[in-house]
Amino acid sequence: IGTSAMKMDKGGPESLLSNLVAGVLQQAAVQVLGKPADMGLVNMGGLRNILPEGDITVGDVFEILPFENSLCVLTMKGTDLRRLFEAIASLHGEGVSGIRLEITKNGKLLNAFVGEKPLKDDQLYTVATIDYLADGNGRMDAFLQAEKRVCPEDATLRGLFLDYVRKQTAEGKAITSKLDGRITIK
């Protein structure tokens, strides 16, 4: 169904595969918000295999994303998002997009930026993630304080990822990702 320009693995604090999948979620929020979410989040534990370089098959995608996780888009206050970021720091990184976190090697949050701007406690932000995390699993209980939560029918992470690969392929593009310092250890 497509081609990967590079081997993509998972792992903290950030990785090629987790960056890619978080970005797919962030973009998928368009179907809920009419625009991408401020950030995307996927847990490393939800990614079960590497994406090899070269041909991508549907089977590869099932191996990477074997769970029936669905998209959820949450609207959260900055104070609650900060708690979410503290949880991500304590886990030494998860798959994120749209944000930049500086954490310590002991798992403490030092600085947080959404887009290019420092996180503001009183602002509302949108987060695209999977239902498993939106339900407060994986230490993400900050999501339970969300102001609003929308989980569209039939928007599985696997389906969204397959759609993304097919769309890129139709445009003649290979699947790529990059490490860009979205989570750094200071």
Label each PLM-derived region with a short phrase.
Residues 1-14:
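Glycine-rich phosphate/diphosphate-binding loops and the adjacent beta-loop-alpha structural elements
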Residues 15, 19-186:
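Feature captures C-terminal
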